[in-house]
């Protein structure tokens, strides 16, 4: 497929596994080295002078450590992006039809506040876990944001000229195993969904309605980290649930208003607890039943109010099985 693309592909930065590994390793070394130096200086000050001086040194260095930590984590994430597979490489090496992921560029930083995403050092985004759950169908690809230095993790990025993006989307829709959209209010995304409704077999179409974190959380590393922290994040997530539920419901109602006339059958009035909408062969929309994390995960995390938790692989199992059988 990659050898016969009818549009111009913008060359992406080549995948460099060794450089990416070194970059991530540098981030980890910086984290542990900085923490070790902090405590060594604290201990040396206590031994050489007094406990008070040691405490003052500890407090004085704390802002520098707190300020540098996000940069270390970003370095780890950058290394992972450098060694992430590129879409063209996957299309050349994997004979299966791809899964096309549609989303608004504004949702590229949409973090996943659920378990097990909270156990990761680098903040995990919805896209990464969604792509992981769909890779059994084929390579998951998406058009990349123009000008981004490295591709985001999740769907492998393909870059095209601004004048060609619609042709690229339609080309892959005609050859895809499935089309999955992270729904948001975006004119470009709505055009893509409209085209998908017209060109893609309805049973291959899947819509995901995420829980959007507040803008002030997405714009701050530490707020994102605390929201995803396995311990403290549990309480913050419960506090954030009403607002995130309201934003998710608003996305769905905007989608209903925009696409009611484009679908053969009416959409449900509300999502309820469902996160995904799929379609049957006749085009009838169906809410995928929400699944809870496994009992083992809930016991290990003491998480018994799993409102925001999306166990992607478990929840998407019916859709994946249906598409695989088509």
Question: Residue ranges of each PLM-predicted region?
Answer:
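N-terminal topogenic membrane-targeting module
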Residues: 2-10, 69-157
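Juxtamembrane interface helix immediately N-terminal to a transmembrane segment
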Residues: 9-31
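Hydrophobic alpha-helical transmembrane segments
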Residues: 26-27, 33-64
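Short beta-alpha junction loops
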Residues: 105-106, 146-148, 185, 208-219
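Short, flexible/disordered intra-domain loops and linkers
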Residues: 109-122, 156-159, 217-225, 238-245
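Donor nucleotide-activated moiety binding/catalytic core segment of transferases
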Residues: 158-179
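Amphipathic helical hotspot of TIR/SEFIR-family domains
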Residues: 185-214
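C-terminal interaction surface of TIR/SEFIR-family domains
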Residues: 222-326
